[in-house]
Structure formats: structure tokens, C-alpha cells
Design a protein with these regions (language model features):
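Active-site-adjacent loops and short helices of periplasmic peptidoglycan-processing enzymes
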Residues: 1-51, 57-64, 68
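Domain-terminus/edge residues, biased toward the C-terminal soluble/receptor-binding domains
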Residues: 30-31, 44-200
Length: 200
């Protein structure tokens, strides 16, 4: 499927599409990512980091069609002039589905696996109007979901969204307690940040 999409978008050329992938990653600020194919299959010169992958995922999440696809538990493909029966397509992210690995607030994500890279998982979750993305790499089938859940639990348990300025020319934000570090910020409209504990 990925090669078919690549040929279509790349004007018949998979390599042209891969060039677009690398250009887009660079434009997003990814500094440790290089693609060699559209599928993610192993190549010594095909690599990324958890940070870059989170950056790419967050950009993709801005697309409402992408959000709908990754958040859909299953899709029933109707009969066609070629197939005379319905086909079920199931989401592989078990944090989205009902069962022991379900995670409340999960919005979907993308699973991945190769023998070289191991299990990878990119997942979005939202609670109390705060959305987090979690990326686990080189994990195992046994622990990829529990590791992701633990990271989400830590994030939701220790951080919250805070509006630090709204229609103000300048405000001071204390980043560390006891005046250890503060920062003057100016924004044209509003800026929200995630704060840890009671440090504002």
C-alpha cells in the first residue's frame, strides 16, 4: 500500500516521494531523521528518533482525515464489482480497542515492527483537555503497551495545561521555584504551556 501511495503522490516515482518525505521532515525541524523508503522497512540509512517521530506524528495529527483513520476501531469495506463479500479492516492499536490493553482517552496511533527495530508504537491520548503523544522504540510485543501506558500515566499525573498569557504585551513566567529561573515572554495572542507540579 505504501509503495502504491508513494508512486501516486510521487508522480510515478517512489524515490521522488521519499525525497518529499525527507524534505517535509526537515521542514518540521527533524534533525535526526532520514528516510530511504515509504514503508519503514529496514535500511541502514533509514532512521529516526523518538523526538523526531513525535514531531512528525503531531504534524500529521493536524489533519482531520488522519485523526479519523487512526481513531477508527474497525472499518467494513463494502462489496464491490470485484469482491462479493464485505471485508473487515481492524485497527492494530490495542490501546484504542476494548480489552486489557485499552487506555482511557486514547485517540489512536500507529504500530510498527521489524526484526531489526523491534516493536514501535506512536500513540495519542487526551485527558482534561490536554493531549499527549507517546513514542516507544525498540520495545517488545509484551511491553510496548504497558510502557506507553506508564508514560501516559506519568504525563497526565504530573503535568497540566496552563495559559500563561492572553492578550498581554508581556508576562513573567517562573519556570523553577524560589526564583531560581524566570522568563519574560511576549505573545501576540495567547500561549499555553505544560507545567510540572506547582512550578509556574
Amino acid at each position: 500500500v505504501s509503495n502504491g501511495v508513494a508512486e501516486y503522490v510521487g508522480g510515478g516515482s517512489i524515490s521522488a516521494f521519499v525525497d518529499k518525505m525527507n524534505e517535509r521532515a526537515a521542514s518540521l525541524g527533524c534533525t535526526n531523521t532520514h528516510f530511504m523508503n515509504p514503508s519503514g522497512l529496514h535500511d541502514d540509512n533509514h532512521y529516526t528518533t523518538a523526538r523526531d517521530l513525535a514531531t512528525i506524528a503531531c504534524s500529521a495529527f493536524q489533519n482531520k482525515i488522519f485523526r479519523k483513520i487512526i481513531g477508527t476501531e474497525y472499518y467494513i469495506e463494502p462489496k464491490t464489482n470485484i469482491t462479493d463479500e464485505e471485508r473487515w479492516l481492524n485497527n492494530h492499536n490495542k490501546m484504542l480497542l476494548s480489552g486489557e490493553k485499552h487506555y482511557d482517552g486514547c485517540l489512536g496511533g500507529k504500530t510498527g515492527y521489524t526484526t531489526t527495530a523491534g516493536n514501535t508504537l506512536v500513540t495519542f491520548a487526551e485527558r482534561d483537555n490536554m493531549r499527549l503523544v507517546c513514542v516507544v522504540l525498540a520495545d517488545t510485543l509484551r511491553f510496548q503497551y504497558s510502557d506507553t501506558a506508564s508514560l501516559f500515566d506519568y504525563g497526565f499525573g504530573n503535568f497540566h495545561k496552563e495559559v500563561i498569557t492572553e492578550n498581554q504585551p508581556e508576562t513573567t513566567v517562573q519556570l523553577l521555584p524560589a526564583d531560581a529561573l524566570s522568563l519574560n515572554v511576549t505573545t501576540p495572542e495567547f500561549l499555553s504551556c505544560v507545567e510540572k507540579g506547582n512550578c509556574v
